[in-house]
């Protein structure tokens, strides 16, 4: 998704600066590429392995008969992923571009200048991989594979190549066919090192974003494009996403976060904002980190709403807001506080939770946009609690010395139901100083008893949110166990 969202931000910014200049956001689908490896996260891996080397647009859908091909199945998922983010884009399929002849003129040029292109690519390959190097990959008319073909002669005057189906590459199983074939009309495609240059030339691309692992590929593609007589687009390399262990997120093994998962635990605008910020810094992207990203977004949304109208257009939030997006959140409540409230109450009763939230800060229901955002966050918190917190929640049985500390807090709260968050926080610190060498050591005890977890929020504000009455109930329940 980042490969589509991030260029859309550049496009929006450009259109604001160059009013009236038409732009196109192209999403290119490499559905004519040969399958080199069976992904680990798909069904029917054995059946799919028989089609290694074939264009993915010709491989049966491993997920069943819901789509005519593997590529169409994945394309349907892309459409589903992009639907919630309100991006205007043009979908371009490799198979259609080659098959319709849209790439034919560029292919003729590549064929005519194949030797110059080979001389650019060859130094980037190991010596043993240079034999048979060709910018053109014919589709074998006998077995339908593309990874197995090896060009043996070029005939640019007739837009033809001679080739044999004998190369064992990327799992391909060559059939041994030998013959001559046109490179036009979908009968061939270019190799992956020439892909970008072909597209940039044929589609007149001005701007391209890519991961930092493709910096060398972009540089190489620019050199090839110059051979074709084109001008390389402006490039923008971005950093990779990391999982919670700091490893690069891999699509092939299914690591990462899907859009469906994200929207279960957070508004889609939070994802858009996350992808907008710091694209040249590696950032961790995993489900358990979402609550912090939500609060980062809410802070930015408050700043956006507080800005003068003429200044909002330059605020990052303005690029991610959608037609249905609340444009304000007039409360200091955080997603973390809402999640901790849900955890402490241990209920999915929406009305009860909402009453607690409005009781703590009536501003959450002060206007339709803030209220709508608040209820979206409440639903997200309930989902996150059910999936991540509740399954790991353990009831803590306090020791004798700890029980005395809890009784002291119960007595204070029972006698001071109207105490402020600051007064409650001070009492907790006083108890910490009385019982530990460092006052902060009391907090893990209270988090275990009140929330069933090791860490948590500032307790003064949280106890005010969840109400001293409810906290006394939980503390007494722990003391009676």
What are these regions (language model features)?
Residues 89, 202, 304, 311-326, ...:
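Short amphipathic alpha-helical segments and their helix-coil junctions
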Residues 110, 267, 446:
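Residue-level signal for inorganic ion chemistry
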Residues 14-18, 82-89, 114-121, 147, ...:
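A generic secondary-structure signal for well-formed alpha-helical elements
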Residues 17, 24-26, 118, 126, ...:
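Basic, alpha-helical terminal appendages of large translation-related enzymes
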Residues 1-118, 221-222, 228:
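N-terminal Rossmann-like or analogous alpha/beta NTP/dinucleotide-binding catalytic cores
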Residues 213, 218, 228, 238-383, ...:
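Catalytic adenosine-cofactor/nucleotide-binding cores of aminoacyl-tRNA synthetases and other
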Residues 87-91, 95-253, 259:
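Active-site cores that bind ATP or allylic diphosphates and position pyrophosphate for catalysis
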């Amino acid at each position: 998704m980042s490969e589509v969202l991030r260029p859309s931000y550049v496009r929006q910014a450009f259109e604001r600066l160059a009013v009236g200049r038409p732009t196109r956001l192209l999403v290119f689908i490499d559905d004519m590429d040969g399958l080199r490896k069976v992904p680990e996260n798909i069904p029917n891996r054995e059946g799919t392995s028989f089609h290694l080397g074939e264009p993915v647009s010709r491989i049966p859908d491993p997920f069943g008969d819901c789509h005519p091909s593997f590529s169409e199945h994945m394309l349907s998922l892309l459409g589903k992923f992009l639907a919630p983010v309100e991006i205007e884009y043009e979908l371009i399929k490799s198979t259609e571009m080659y098959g319709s002849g849209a790439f034919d003129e560029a292919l003729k040029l590549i064929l005519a200048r194949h030797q110059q292109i080979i001389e650019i690519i060859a130094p980037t390959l190991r010596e043993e991989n240079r034999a048979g190097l060709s910018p053109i990959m014919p589709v074998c008319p006998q077995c339908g594979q593309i990874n197995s073909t090896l060009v043996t002669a070029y005939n640019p005057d007739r837009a033809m190549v001679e080739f044999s189906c004998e190369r064992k590459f990327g799992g391909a199983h060559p059939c041994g066919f030998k013959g001559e074939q046109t490179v036009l009309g979908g009968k061939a495609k270019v190799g992956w090192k020439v892909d970008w240059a072909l597209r940039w030339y044929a589609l007149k691309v001005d701007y391209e974003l890519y991961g930092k692992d493709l910096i060398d590929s972009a540089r190489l593609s620019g050199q090839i494009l110059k051979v074709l007589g084109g001008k390389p687009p402006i490039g923008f390399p971005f950093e990779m996403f990391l999982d919670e262990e700091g490893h690069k997120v891999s699509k092939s093994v299914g690591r990462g976060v899907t859009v469906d998962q994200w929207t279960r635990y957070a508004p889609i605008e939070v994802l858009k904002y996350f992808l907008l910020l710091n694209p040249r810094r590696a950032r961790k992207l995993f489900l358990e980190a979402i609550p912090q990203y939500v609060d980062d977004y809410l802070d930015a949304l408050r700043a956006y709403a507080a800005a003068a109208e003429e200044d909002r257009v330059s605020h990052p939030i303005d690029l991610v807001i959608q037609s249905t997006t609340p444009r304000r959140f007039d409360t200091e409540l955080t997603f973390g506080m809402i999640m901790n409230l849900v955890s402490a109450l241990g209920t999915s009763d929406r009305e009860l939770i909402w009453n607690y939230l409005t009781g703590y800060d009536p501003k959450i229901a002060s206007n339709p946009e803030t209220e709508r955002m608040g209820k979206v966050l409440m639903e997200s918190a309930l989902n996150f609690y059910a999936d991540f917190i509740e399954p790991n929640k353990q009831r803590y049985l306090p020791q004798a010395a700890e029980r005395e500390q809890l009784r002291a807090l119960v007595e204070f709260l029972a006698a001071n139901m109207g105490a402020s968050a600051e007064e409650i926080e001070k009492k907790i610190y006083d108890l910490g100083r009385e019982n530990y060498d460092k006052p902060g050591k009391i907090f893990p005890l209270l988090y275990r008893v009140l929330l069933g977890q090791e860490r948590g929020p500032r307790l003064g504000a949280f106890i005010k949110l969840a109400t001293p009455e409810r906290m006394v109930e939980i503390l007494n329940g722990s003391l009676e166990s």
